[in-house]
């Protein structure tokens, strides 16, 4: 908001969240003075457009299959925070199948915009710096889905998830799965799959987690 500095905007978000109000927040950083965020047309138009453009949401069967284990563990009507929600796919599935009021946290502006366009409340926040906008015990469930392997401080993220929710559901790619190990052994290359579609030089995954 052009009327408030960033710290005051965050205080407003915290107050609205504590009061149980619907709130989304995004902070576009700029180093060229007051109102200079208005010059960042590429990002500003996408963020604002997310609130103005409501996309039709259809939950596909493959999306249900992808998140079936999370669906089993979330009770109907629960309050859920999806930490690292991406484009909001999991929130779409939970809303359609469990009647869940789900919110998200996302740092990527383009994926943030997509989740907001799907009608979800999303907080723009770097989870490596904590979830300062979310009060203690505010949610029934915190979901950390395919996010833990991308953050610098996984332990800190898990502590934050259990601070803001009664329980946490954590999913991640199993980097020791036999198919991955076999591909690595036979080709000598980082495996690429639907769940891990990245090359070694552009992957966001910085931890190889296994069971």
Predicted segments with their positions:
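Class I SAM-dependent methyltransferase SAM/SAH-binding core
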Residues: 89, 93-130
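A short SAM/SAH-binding and catalytic strip from SAM-dependent methyltransferases
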Residues: 141-152
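Short conserved loop adjoining the S-adenosyl-L-methionine
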Residues: 130-136
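Conserved alpha/beta-hydrolase "acid-adjacent" motif
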Residues: 3-8
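Conserved class I S-adenosyl-L-methionine
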Residues: 78-86
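Catalytic active-site module of serine/aspartate enzymes centered on a nucleophile-bearing elbow/loop
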Residues: 26-57
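S-adenosyl-L-methionine-dependent methyltransferase catalytic module, highlighting the catalytic core
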Residues: 155-163, 167-211
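Conserved alpha-helix/loop element of class I SAM-dependent methyltransferases that forms part
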Residues: 61-77
């Amino acid at each position: 908001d052009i009327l408030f500095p960033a710290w005051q905007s965050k205080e407003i978000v915290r107050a609205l969240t504590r009061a149980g109000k619907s709130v989304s927040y995004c902070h576009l950083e700029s180093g060229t003075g007051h109102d200079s965020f208005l010059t960042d047309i590429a990002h500003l138009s996408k963020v604002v457009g997310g609130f103005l453009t409501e996309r039709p949401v259809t939950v596909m069967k493959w999306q249900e299959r992808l998140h079936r284990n999370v669906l089993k563990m979330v009770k109907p009507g629960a309050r859920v925070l999806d930490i690292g929600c991406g484009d909001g796919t999991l929130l779409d599935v939970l809303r359609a199948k469990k009647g869940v009021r789900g919110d998200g946290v996302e740092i990527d502006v383009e994926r943030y915009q997509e989740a907001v366009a799907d009608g979800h409340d999303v907080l723009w926040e770097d989870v490596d710096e904590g979830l300062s906008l979310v009060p203690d015990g505010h949610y029934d469930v915190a979901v950390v889905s395919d996010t833990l392997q991308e953050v610098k401080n996984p332990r800190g993220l898990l502590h934050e998830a259990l601070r803001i929710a009664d329980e946490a559901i954590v999913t991640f790619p199993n980097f020791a799965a036999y198919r991955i190990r076999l591909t690595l052994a036979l080709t000598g290359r980082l495996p690429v799959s639907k769940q891990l579609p990245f090359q070694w030089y552009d992957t966001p995954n910085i931890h190889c987690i296994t069971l």
